[in-house]
From Swiss-Prot:
It comes from Homo sapiens. The modification Phosphoserine is found at residue 266. This is Protein transport protein Sec24D. Residues 363-388 are annotated as: Zinc finger-like. It is found in: Cytoplasmic vesicle, COPII-coated vesicle membrane; Endoplasmic reticulum membrane; Cytoplasm, Cytosol. Residues 1-260 are annotated as: Disordered. It is a peripheral membrane protein. It is linked to Cole-Carpenter syndrome 2: A form of Cole-Carpenter syndrome, a disorder characterized by features of osteogenesis imperfecta such as bone deformities and severe bone fragility with frequent fractures, in association with craniosynostosis, ocular proptosis, hydrocephalus, growth failure and distinctive facial features. Craniofacial findings include marked frontal bossing, midface hypoplasia, and micrognathia. Despite the craniosynostosis and hydrocephalus, intellectual development is normal. CLCRP2 inheritance is autosomal recessive. InterPro entries: ADF-H/Gelsolin-like_dom_sf, Gelsolin-like_dom, Gelsolin-like_dom_sf, Sec23/24_helical_dom, Sec23/24_helical_dom_sf, Sec23/24_trunk_dom, Sec23_24_beta_S, SEC23_SEC24_subfamily. Component of the coat protein complex II (COPII) which promotes the formation of transport vesicles from the endoplasmic reticulum (ER). The coat has two main functions, the physical deformation of the endoplasmic reticulum membrane into vesicles and the selection of cargo molecules for their transport to the Golgi complex. Plays a central role in cargo selection within the COPII complex and together with SEC24C may have a different specificity compared to SEC24A and SEC24B. May more specifically package GPI-anchored proteins through the cargo receptor TMED10.
Amino acid sequence: MSQQGYVATPPYSQPQPGIGLSPPHYGHYGDPSHTASPTGMMKPAGPLGATATRGMLPPGPPPPGPHQFGQNGAHATGHPPQRFPGPPPVNNVASSHAPYQPSAQSSYPGPISTSSVTQLGSQLSAMQINSYGSGMAPPSQGPPGPLSATSLQTPPRPPQPSILQPGSQVLPPPPTTLNGPGASPLPLPMYRPDGLSGPPPPNAQYQPPPLPGQTLGAGYPPQQANSGPQMAGAQLSYPGGFPGGPAQMAGPPQPQKKLDPDSIPSPIQVIENDRASRGGQVYATNTRGQIPPLVTTDCMIQDQGNASPRFIRCTTYCFPCTSDMAKQAQIPLAAVIKPFATIPSNESPLYLVNHGESGPVRCNRCKAYMCPFMQFIEGGRRYQCGFCNCVNDVPPFYFQHLDHIGRRLDHYEKPELSLGSYEYVATLDYCRKSKPPNPPAFIFMIDVSYSNIKNGLVKLICEELKTMLEKIPKEEQEETSAIRVGFITYNKVLHFFNVKSNLAQPQMMVVTDVGEVFVPLLDGFLVNYQESQSVIHNLLDQIPDMFADSNENETVFAPVIQAGMEALKAADCPGKLFIFHSSLPTAEAPGKLKNRDDKKLVNTDKEKILFQPQTNVYDSLAKDCVAHGCSVTLFLFPSQYVDVASLGLVPQLTGGTLYKYNNFQMHLDRQQFLNDLRNDIEKKIGFDAIMRVRTSTGFRATDFFGGILMNNTTDVEMAAIDCDKAVTVEFKHDDKLSEDSGALIQCAVLYTTISGQRRLRIHNLGLNCSSQLADLYKSCETDALINFFAKSAFKAVLHQPLKVIREILVNQTAHMLACYRKNCASPSAASQLILPDSMKVLPVYMNCLLKNCVLLSRPEISTDERAYQRQLVMTMGVADSQLFFYPQLLPIHTLDVKSTMLPAAVRCSESRLSEEGIFLLANGLHMFLWLGVSSPPELIQGIFNVPSFAHINTDMTLLPEVGNPYSQQLRMIMGIIQQKRPYSMKLTIVKQREQPEMVFRQFLVEDKGLYGGSSYVDFLCCVHKEICQLLN
């Protein structure tokens, strides 16, 4: 987008150090052109690869490369390692549903035992858990460390029968679940000089074995200055599993025992522990680099100089001082920024600062805005910028004397000096063409093709808009909204409506030339709702009848967006299009699409094509929309393939939202759709936005993920940004960081309010820096890490084979944990898996990401659904991605009707269900109520008002309003869960042992997937094996 006339010189014109001075980076997966595997990163027959099924690798030199990803991220080609045994062949859905075995136990029998074997897992013994706190190391574990930890140990197991010697030939394992069902096996492994078996990656360069006395290879250089104190971590031990394990000298074989899932780290326990220690308290942001409560913990946040974690969460709150440390640890340095996050009513709203025509005070060199990180000197006449260290003169209007500690006397009176987040009123320098913007407009665009008329959708939309238009957002002090509204209907042609307030009847104008769309009227198209209410209601009453006899099935789509954008452009205002659409646009027009849903591409290198838009029309249309501040929100009602990858591109790139209701049925889906529409119309939103992330010297923002457009390396452009959208930003070093000054981040968003005022919203955050790797690991936040990994992987889906992306994710998980083990943990047996306390649930969350249908196809999931989920995750904040990948599972049968507390959640595994139980599962998109066959009759009566399990109607999507405590309590709990989520969750009732349970079971993410995807236990074993291989 051309910036001319968009933002004048003061705000964003001058470069700052470290911004825009290098070519763009491509995150952790690289752009399509970078596909060579960096040395030491990919191990085609690594620990999860085609090694001997029961064999062991001889100790040898370490992997050759220093780290897994180069400066521009990891790039890999060829076959990634095979990982887990694949599922049995699937003939049809019904037969793959394991029958329930009659059981005397109350526990819920699963189709796959939790001790289901892999080549490693089959030899695991039972684990016992031994916890030791920060002051106690386990016996023979070396010095105590500062971190609390959990140690999981296993008794010895039988020695492995064979050791892989040079030249040994072993058969590859069966096709793996990580590479998708049916993946072809890899070639036979062969001996390599670095001690790893398997074929070398293309272009790999080998290093000779180390000379006598030489240390481990560059992959894990020994730490001296930055080794830090020893830290205890969660430890799982698998004696004898790996080279160096004590079981090589073990006695007679011991009987195999089941691996106990209770002995591995539990996400539920981590969530509950944090709630117990920090829930309901005040969290003050006055300390640099402090780790906030988890997103799952409710607390009151008090801004005392750093932005609330509602606005910014980081993957780690302590950055490594050098890029070498960052490469060694492999922990992504990133922030998830949600600039318009909703602030609870018990917390202070953002203060608005108005400096009149002078505008915000900014650093002359780097253009950072005045904030708590600026240091005033020389009696208050000058200040030193915290970001670039430039010394600036204080403008005369802004001068104030300093107190005895060098702080301004008005420190606590000025939000920009004492708070982490605040807003400025922007001057004309920050406006397009240096003139104030007009208030935004909402345009409602309704597909009136045959199917939408016949199923009653058009009538429903028109009816509901009458009441919803009353709720169009307005400024708190205003009586009416400044937002204007307009209406268009379409099928193969476009119908514009004149609803000027002085008309007796609305007037329709038809545009048939969809190749060159124009706006046939200006005056009367965009109107104030209050003034034209009667004409608008008249129109909404007429539309369903107007098209009642239409037999037109073909629709256009791109011209609809074009028409809305041209209307906003003609009115010289930003705005939002609400498009209600239901079919593949097959009519002759720009953006015409064909059905390209090809299942043959699944599990091939061409699978990425399914996620790419079919034509470049939508990409250029999105750029035009952003250039004119036009955001697009799309409500899709498909009954078959509609190519979400193409249709959803404009909503994604313009800061809009995509909602999808498959096979829409009025009686089942009406409420979900209306809830979504109402929330979308009413939500807090900013228009025509540009975001810039500034950093202190030593590091810079290099990559951005979200519903955004970038025409250069620094400015994040968004036609609109609302309270649910987050942008994830990755940082890289460009120099050393100082422990004293830390790492400072300032996010500035320039936007237009719903009343047409131009503002700047500023968020500031200070992080610590350390030369000790231990500090970096102590300060990590797993929920933010998973948000980053998901977005970087889902972005890479457009350019790289999915199996390569899955491989990179497993590789990086192992690298992070191996670096911790080598440099931070107390000495321990090689057979123990040691996890940092802050990352002990990283493996389970990473496995959930790997099993998501975007990265691992499943036969029952459509191509459109995969494209839809990919798009949703790209704009999610940390709380939404946490719930999406690890759903909440609540035992409803344990409800205490006298308490307002939610029942304690249980782990997402079939083993946690019981025949006597009723469970509620929610992941932010779906909600299920699962009913065991022996559910208590009094609960069934209380919730459904029917006498028994057999009488329950599973078609209902809303619970009946039964006037008893159980029903009221359950509906209250569902309301609480729903209230915090951006999408309305339709309820599905699932009975144990009935067919719909197949869908429900896919959300039990700790279990093995029906069509691929490892169980949590198996994944943990495989990560451990890979860590051991890295360390050896």
